[in-house]
Amino acid sequence: MNPALFSNELEYLYTGQGFGEAFEFLYESFESRLSEPQPEGDAEELRIDKLRKDLVFMWRSRLYSDIRISLTGTFSSTPHEDTTAVFASHRFILVSRSPYFYNALVSWAKPKPQQANEPITLSLPSPPFTPASLHFTLGFLYTGTLIFSSTPYDLNTAFAILRSATYLSLDTLYDEIQARIIQEMMHGLFHTFLSFAEYERLTSSKWGTGGCRCRQCARRAPRVLEFAVAHDVRNPYLERGARRALISLFGEGWCTSEFAALPQKLRESLLKGVGKHMTVENVFPLLFAAEHALIKLNPVNDAWGDTVREMIESGRRALDEVLCNQAEACFMQLEWLEIMENDGARFEDGEKAEWIMEAILRGMNDKNCAILYQVRATTI
């Protein structure tokens, strides 16, 4: 075999460029050769897309497969029963795309096939790998992207993919799945890539702004936070964004079993984070959020409801103190002025005024009662 020719063939196999263009010309239809030439950028994208599809076909059809990867763990619906999942793959893809597989197949002692003429089998640990995460990880190795398939993956699988990327030293896969968790699954995760100073400047230090507070984010944020602080993950971006989200979700956003399931130390740190936002400017929005949460928790009889109720009431007590100790400044805020100007015309104004009066009664003490009396006479 001509070495130069073989080198060109390998270049095309790996990159989709070079040698193969001659064959593409020979096998293209006469009509396609007469068509208008496409811009270089589009042509490049088409070549890459074609290469991806060819490699995925080769992988899924097991064409020329020369290696197997096995996982053993409790994957089935039957608890405490180990099962084994086996994936067919190609040595040249694994070695060229992953430092871990390069070491396993080239540098370390070579595993031997169980029988003659059988491909060798590599075993991977579970955890961190699961059948779903390994499927997407292998797909990424073949295509360079996680969108090689229309099959979706859930948040747990995304977590497993990130752990798999760490295990295999795949920085590009790590970055992609991290970005997809943040942007697609958590709707931006409260601008997690911004520093504290940049985020405060963006939100003007107003609580509850700067990110998505939908029901999906409220249920997923506790899971993202617990995952991010795990000893084998320690992801600063996921942790920072999840903390921002949960602090901004104080109130009804905490009324989930997922939040109650967080370790107590994490829940206390989040309440402390809310406390840092208990400023004069934020006192009324936070107080209203706490009251709405307590109303939502009224029909909840499960144990998790008691856990959340205790957290909300603890936060509300701190808000009562801020309101009573800084009453003069608080009652100059827009939320109160709007209630007074509308003269109770809006249905919710009466309810909010009642919540504020109850907060004053709870927070009043010997030290602030004189100030509260003066404010009541001039403002309330």
Give the residues covered by each predicted segment:
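Alpha-helical oligomerization interface recognition
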Residues: 1-3, 62-119, 131, 138, ...
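N-terminal BTB/POZ boundary and linker segment
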Residues: 2-91, 95, 139-158, 163, ...
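Alpha-helical protein-protein interaction/assembly modules
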Residues: 5, 9, 18, 22-31, ...
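Short amphipathic alpha-helices and their capping/turn residues within compact interaction modules
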Residues: 14, 18, 98-99, 106, ...
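A general structural signal for short secondary-structure junctions and capping/turn motifs
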Residues: 58-61, 78-79, 83-85, 126-127, ...
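Short coil/turn segments at helix-helix junctions and helix-capping linkers
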Residues: 92, 125, 129, 164-171, ...
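Extended alpha-helical solenoid/arm regions of large eukaryotic scaffolding proteins
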Residues: 123-124, 136
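Structural signal for repeat-unit boundaries in curved repeat scaffolds
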Residues: 131-134, 158
